[in-house]
Amino acid sequence: GKPAGKVGFYPGVMMASQDEIYITIKGKAGHGAKPQSAIDPIVIASQVVLALQTIVSRNTDPYEPIVITIGKFVGGTINNVIPDTTELSGTVRTLNEKLRRDTLKLIERTIKGITQAAGAGYEFRVSPGYPELNNSAKETAFTQSSAIEFLGKENVFKGERFMFAEDFAY
């Protein structure tokens, strides 16, 4: 946080878009003692989670921030049974609309490739969230000069970009 009485301004895209992703990996249930008779969705989902991180590190420009976070991973209910499905959900955040669309396509392509290779199926659903917060340069400059006038230049600073999302983006 910043000290009270200080305000920051950032013209242009300041906060990320935010989408929720929901993934179901569809395997084939089986007994833990006979894994060869099952298609283990937990193992496949684990591969998906790891592979999604390569989208960030290997498929996007390092100067274009992107976040893919899987925050929920649920598979199975009994310790000696391979379940038939595993559920994943997470968030995707970007700072430009094209990267947002491209990232969601790459996510599905990654899931499809891994599940096909394992003989499994999948469902992929996106719940679109907030767009990126884009501050108008003109209005930002006007508001910043007003803040300098009322608070003093020493209390006004250049803000920074965040990968958080904000409903004010609408």
Give residue ranges: language-model regions.
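Generic non-transmembrane alpha-helical segments
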Residues: 44-59, 106-118, 142-150
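Flexible, glycine/charged-enriched surface loops at secondary-structure junctions
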Residues: 57-67, 116-125, 153-161
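Short, hydrophobic beta-strand segments
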Residues: 23-25, 86-94, 124-128
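A glycine-rich, aromatic-flanked flexible loop/lid motif
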Residues: 19, 78-86, 114-122, 138-140
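Active-site glycine- and acidic-residue-rich loops that bind
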Residues: 36, 96-101, 105, 161-163, ...
